[in-house]
Amino acid sequence: MPKTTYELEREANIARNRALIEQLELKNAAASVTGSVNPKVSAKPKPPQKPRAKPVQPIKREKRILEDTPRRASARLRKSVINLVDETAAQKRKREQEEEAWRRNEEEERLAAEERAREAKKARHHELDLEVLAGQEEWEPGALSGLSSRLQSLLQARHPRRRGDQDAFVFDNSKRENVEVAALRERLQNMAIVARAKVTQDRVYSAAYHPEPTKDLIFFGDKHGQLGIWDARAPADETEEDDVDRDQREAGKYWRLQVHWPATAQSSISCIKVDPIDAHGVYTSAYDSTVRSLSFTSGISREVFAMEKVLITSMDLPPASHEMWLSDAEGWVTHLDLREDKTRRRAYQVSDQKIGCVSVNPTNPAFILTASNNRALKIWDVRKLRKLPAPQGVLELELEDVEKIKESKEGTAILRGEWKHDRSVTSAYWDPRGRAIVSTSYDDALRIWDIQPSLMTKNPPFPDFRPFARIRHNCQTGKWLTMLKAQWSPNPDVYPHFTIGDMDHSLDIFGWKGDLLAKLSDKERVSATQAVTCSHPSVVERVASGNGSGRCVLWAPAHLVAE
C-alpha cells in the first residue's frame, strides 16, 4: 500500500531532525576538545563565586521527655475475642455492659480533650512561673535554675531609666559639633559581629537591651508570643558538634519563654520595655490583647492589662513613673496607672485607623507622639484630657468626642503638631532628651524634627511643625519581614543617634542631624535583613539586631571577638 502524503512528510521531518541532532553532537564534541565551538571566540573564565553567608546553627539539645498521653483506639480492636456461639445470656449482658461503660468513658475522654484544646487556644490571664513559661521548650538540665540565677543577679543594683538635658549636644559652634560627630563615628565604625544565636523560634518582632553595664542581656519578642532572653557574651556551654563549623556555632546563652498564649501569630509580641523604675523586670505587649510584666525578683509573669480582641501595637513608659501608654489597631491610645487595678484606664480614640506607635516625651511626659496608618504623625498635650472626670476609674472617649474637645475653647492646645507623610507612618519616637523626633514611613523616608523646649512651655500649637531633615531609606519590607523602625539610642551621655535595619542586610546608624555615622555589615555572616534593632542604654558601642528567622546578632568593638 503506497504511503500517504502525510506519512512521507512525517518521515522527512524525522530525517531532518536526526541530521540536526547528529550535527549538534559533533559540534559539542569538537567544543570539548578545542575548548570552544568557534575557535575565534575564546571562552571567558567564570569569576570565582563569593561564599554565601551561612546562618548560625542552633545548638542541638536533647528533647524534654513528656508523659505519654493515652491515644484513642478502635472499639473493634480493643474488643476481646469471644466465642459468641457458646456465650450464655448472662455473659452477653455482662459483655454489653462493659462495652457500654467503655464507650461512655471513651466519649468523656474525647470531650475532655476537646475542652483542653479549646482552653489551650485562649489567652492566659493568670500568673505564670518560669516552669510554666518554659513549657515544652527543649532545655538542658539546670537551664531553668541558670535563668533564675541570671535574673536574680540583675537585682544587685538599680538602673532607673535616664533622661537627657533638652539643651545637650546643641552647639553654637559647628566645629565643636563636627568634633563630637567625628569622635562618635570613629567609635561606631569600629564595631563588628561578636556574637550570633537563634534566640527565638520565629520572626523577631521587638527587642530591648537591659541597662546593666557589665552585661549584654537582650530581650527579643517573636511572632508567636515567645520571649527570648539572650546573654550574648556569656561563656557558651561546651558541646562538641563535629558537623558544625566553629564560626557557625552559637555564642552566649539564651532561654525561651512562652510569655503570651496561644503560640500563634495572634500573640506576636509587639513591644518590650525594661521597667523604667529599677530595671528589675520587663513589660511585654502582644497581639493577644494583653500586657504582661515579668518580675526578675519572683520569676513570675503577671497580667497588667487586657483588652477585648484588639491588637496592642505599642507601649511606652515615662522615666521614674508608674504610668503606661498603649496604642492599638483601632486608633485608640490608653493611659494606665500601674499602681491601680488593671480594670481602671483612660482611653482616647485619636485616629480613624491603626496607631502603630506611641512615644512619651521623657522630659515632658504630657507630650505624646502617635504614628498612624492614616499617614499622620501627631503631638498631643494630654494634660487637659486627664482633667476630664472618669467615673469608676474608666474613661473612654471616641473619636467624635475627642474632635469636639479639640474644637472647643478649652481644647485648642490639645493637638500641638501634625505632619502628613506620603504613606503610612510605621513609627515615631522622642530622643532621650525629649527634643528630637525621628519617624519611619512606607514612603521610603526617615524624617527628623527638632522641637525647641520653649515651645512646650506655651499653650498654642507649634507655629511650624516641619521636619528639618529627610533621609531616603528603603522601607518596603513586604509581608515576610518585620516593619523597619528607627530606634534612638537610649544613652543620654552621648551625641544623639539612632539605628535602623537596611534592606541590603546592613545596620545603619545616623546622628540626630541626619549624618550617616556607620553602616555595619558582614556579607559572610549576615544574609538577611536586620529588621529589629536596639542599643545598650549604658554602653555606646553595643547594638543588637534580629531577623525574620529568629537569628540575632550582637555588634560591638571588634577586639571583643577574641576575648
Short names for language-model regions:
Residues 372, 432, 436-442:
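Long, repeat-rich segments with strong aromatic
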Residues 139, 143-339, 347-363, 418-420, ...:
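WD40 beta-propeller repeat fold
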Residues 1-204, 558:
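Intrinsically disordered terminal extensions that flank WD40 beta-propeller domains
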Residues 391, 451-461:
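Short acidic alpha-helical/loop segments enriched in Asp/Glu that coordinate divalent cations
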Residues 396-410, 460-493:
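A surface-exposed beta-alpha-beta supersecondary segment
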Residues 362, 368-416:
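Acidic, glycine-rich loop-and-beta core segments that form the ion-binding/anion-interacting portion
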Residues 5, 413-416, 474:
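Conserved short-loop catalytic and cofactor-binding motifs
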